[in-house]
Amino acid sequence: MDHPERFDVIVVGGGHAGTEAAMAAARIGARTLLLTHSIETVGQMSCNPAIGGIGKGHLVREIDALGGIMARAADRGGIQFRTLNSRKGPAVRATRAQADRQLYRQAIRRAVENQPRLALFQQSVDDLIVEGGRVTGVVTGMGLRFRAPAVVLTVGTFLGGRIHIGESNYGGGRAGDPAANALAARLRELPFQVDRLKTGTPPRLDGRTIDWARLTEQPGDDPAPVFSFLGRPDEHPAQVPCHIAHTRPETHDIIRGALDRSPMYSGTIEGVGPRYCPSIEDKVVRFADKGSHQIFLEPEGLDTHEVYPNGISTSLPFDVQYELVRSIPGLEQARIVRPGYAIEYDFFDPRGLHPTLETRHLEGLWFAGQINGTTGYEEAAAQGLLAGLNAALRVQGREPWYPRRDQAYLGVLVDDLITRGTREPYRMFTSRAEYRLMLREDNADLRLTPIGRDLGLVDDERWRRFNAKREALEREQARLAATLIRPGDLPDALARQVLGGPLRKEQRLEELLRRPDVGYADLMRLPGAGDPVPDAEVVEQLEIQARYAGYLERQHDEVARARRHEQLPLPEGLAYDRVAGLSSEVREKLAAHRPATVGQAARIPGVTPAAVSLLLVHLRRQGLLRESA
């Protein structure tokens, strides 16, 4: 039967991608339905209890700048906060929070349930309704049909999911949840290029059986940072430390002796695992010369004794897991409360997507999250926001939106996926962004909140707070640029103390702030400097923008040069076999990828600068060379 209600957007899956997709669609006015196999697991952290990290924290801040919910939930559920790379430049500094699983999930569910125009319904989805070459709805496991002109699939590891523990394996989307096998079979019938990936999780430990005195304590930062631009440190729950342990040669011997029982090495698992989060058996094999590997013992929450040993993800048999855990100093008496496992699942080649994350083969269908070959909560959530936004924009008859590589890490993520594809779970790093000095955590709001406001993603309170910060920043920048400090007004002793030496000539405060060892607080000690601004975020922006002004200017120039051709659109049906001078290899790659712009074409592996020049010549001759709006 058909459900009596009609929706604009249907989101399938209530994980990190699904919740952001549903929230984004509803925020801009679309009647949205979020379908999940269990309302109790909406917003669940299926793997490690943490948000953020290098590159990932940048995505969380961008989601927040666009009105998303991940950062707010992390602030309310975070039980340890740290700024990574704090001694390095601002481009690579990143926030990471250890989260209480229950508090985080509750924060997400609360946001979803209180969002206007967003309905929740508990049912798995077994089929898509396809009519006239486009998706028009879904069919649930009980045969109930929901209709909508836009459907977003955010199904995580559930498509054809198979869990492996040693020689045993069984169907599942994660431990305790069934796989979406019917939907996986249906998608395999459609014209998508499907493959398999693998990820894993470590055994969970009972913290009461760990000898904490033998481990190295790793405290959080004090004061603790926040993720959200609206967040405050006093919103954080109680803060707790993590601890560090180490494997030893005996641990590695146990693992090597059981490799023939590992599904990864016996050939049972065919999917490719994450390069940057390898299993412990992978680490022991790939880094055979290392006598020890770090393990981070992370608390799962404030009201549980369960501990997540980050660094020993494994699919080895339980008896081997038991032995290897107890070979680690400090864990000799540790009790395993949940076994580690690997999970293998379907994903679809993301080169079959538009930059909006709508599929090229079926109109009205968007993919977001692990279905596109990514790994990580943050990567999934960012894609979900973009997919849900564009699904709603389509229904409303509005122009699509997606960020460029120089605008956001989200732009880098999507461009990498749709241009280059992936053969292994894709993880975001700052090193993937060529314009990373412009794409910092601290300026995500300045980059994206005005865009989010125009799209309808940003509410009045966030917009008010953002404008207050932006106006304070602009006022103080103007004041620093206009305020002169003269040598005669500055005692030599104070000049040496603040500036490192006497002031030789008249200088503006703005110029003095560009000195590497001079901070804003130092400047405010100078006679005639005026009153300081109280907002720490404004001060941070003043220092970064002054200190890195020259580098930022050069990067802006690089962006301008690159954008001359970056946004030149390529006709969707362009016949690459008619472009004179292109090699067969380049023609095949362009035809397979179908890049939307010249910039995307240039980033396809194997497409040379010479090939791009030939492409531009062809477009010019055909009268197709026009600037994109």
From Swiss-Prot:
FAD binds at residues 13-18. Its cofactor is FAD. InterPro entries: FAD/NAD-bd_sf, GIDA_C_N, MnmG, MnmG-rel, MnmG-rel_CS, MnmG_C, MnmG_C_subdom, MnmG_C_subdom_sf. NAD(+) binds at residues 273-287. Its main location: cytoplasm. It is found in: Cytoplasm. It comes from the Bacteria. One of its GO terms (biological process) is tRNA methylation. One of its GO terms (cellular component) is cytosol. GO terms for molecular function: flavin adenine dinucleotide binding. Keywords: Cytoplasm, FAD, Flavoprotein, NAD, tRNA processing. Homodimer. Heterotetramer of two MnmE and two MnmG subunits. Belongs to the MnmG family. NAD-binding protein involved in the addition of a carboxymethylaminomethyl (cmnm) group at the wobble position (U34) of certain tRNAs, forming tRNA-cmnm(5)s(2)U34. PANTHER family: GLUCOSE INHIBITED DIVISION PROTEIN A, PROTEIN MTO1 HOMOLOG, MITOCHONDRIAL. NCBIfam families: mnmG_gidA. This is tRNA uridine 5-carboxymethylaminomethyl modification enzyme MnmG. It comes from Alkalilimnicola ehrlichii (strain ATCC BAA-1101 / DSM 17681 / MLHE-1). The gene is mnmG.
